[in-house]
Amino acid sequence: MNVSVVLPSFNRARLLPITIPTYFQEDVSEVILVDDCSSDNTAEVVKELQTRFPTLRYFRNEVNSKQPYTQNVAISKVLSEYIDCGDDDSVLYPGSIRNLLNVMREKNADIVGGRALALFFPEQIDELDEFLSHYRNRIATEANQIVDLSTLSTNFTYTVKEPIKVPFCHASCLCKTQVAREMQFDVKIEGNAYREETDFLIRATLAGYTIYYTSSANQINLPSAMCSGGARSKNHRHWAENAIRNNDYFIDKNYDSMQKMFSLPRTKDEMKALFRVQIKKQVRQKHIMDFLERIGLFKIIYHIKHKFD
């Protein structure tokens, strides 16, 4: 067993009994949870979980220090050769870590990312096989279907027949510990920490490390209603402002190196402007989903759509 799972966490005590057990898979020697100074009963919940999972290690920041700093603390505590990056609001599908390890060894990769999916309704937690079946025929054959650097757009829901080399993957990934310690997460990425993983991973590629994407591993976000106390966050504008600010910082920091390696077709300013358009579209979509949910139509539309997939 030579994989450490790292889980930064903040005020997710009620989710941890659902998510943490899914990370104790074959090849996992420890799960490290770093509590970013939560105000809920995270410490008590973890203590109870430790009676079932003795290799669950718990650390707590003295002050709230945000996601990148907390990620770095977790990495510093790792005792294994490999790190699996988890989320406190996601479950990991059985067998995912073994499959990530197999791809890493077969491809001599430094980082391997899996699919990143999201449940829509709480009852889907007990129907993961059926949920995953909806993505079976969404097949990608080229890297730019998964990561398009010309627009910085991604789709980590695709099924692939063979692992595909990509410039970066989703945050849900297996990484060599020495690579993670060399790269480190950038603590200047603030607020909602948008682009923290993209920055970490693209810098790994720019440094000469190899990253692959596989659909044989699946990290699945819990429904947003469960993660936000029964309703989606309505502060979409604040989220978008944070995302734009962090994206601008990411582009200013990495554009020249990315341009040199990938010959990007857009200028730095064009990339920033395009992202603003994309974010505005996302916010509109979130408002529409909120409205459909309020009037009880979202679930009906979802099931009709997937009936014909």
Predicted regions mapped to residue ranges:
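Short aromatic/hydrophobic "clamp" motif used to bind/position activated sugar donors
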Residues: I83
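Glycine-rich, basic loop-to-helix element that forms the pyrophosphate-binding segment
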Residues: N61-V78
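Short, well-formed alpha-helical segments that are part of the catalytic scaffolds
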Residues: N11-Q25
